[in-house]
């Protein structure tokens, strides 16, 4: 619901009350409308600031992404060179049977590495979950006990005080 100052003034004038009360009410209404306008301006400023930050982050992301793509392309080119040299040497030095055995071992090793990667990913996800739970519990504990020890604060036992 949106009101303007004139509507409020007309509303207050329509009510039978002393002039001083009307003036006070109008003053309060003006203050509230001014505060509302300030809130709207602050909201707009925050929106603009957020949009600017998002744009800056987007530019930074794309810049870093392009750098990583370029590095990936360089590494891929180098890898392709090694692959070519490796194939050339295999053709020169091995028989067809040895090539099949080498490919089998290569695929087997890749499968093992893939399984290890999946295991590591699972472990990372579990650790992240535990970290999130720990942080949540720590925040709860910190909120419930504001005197909770801060980082690197020495713990003094009661025995040492005696």
Swiss-Prot record:
Protein name, as recorded: Uncharacterized protein V11
Organism: Sputnik virophage
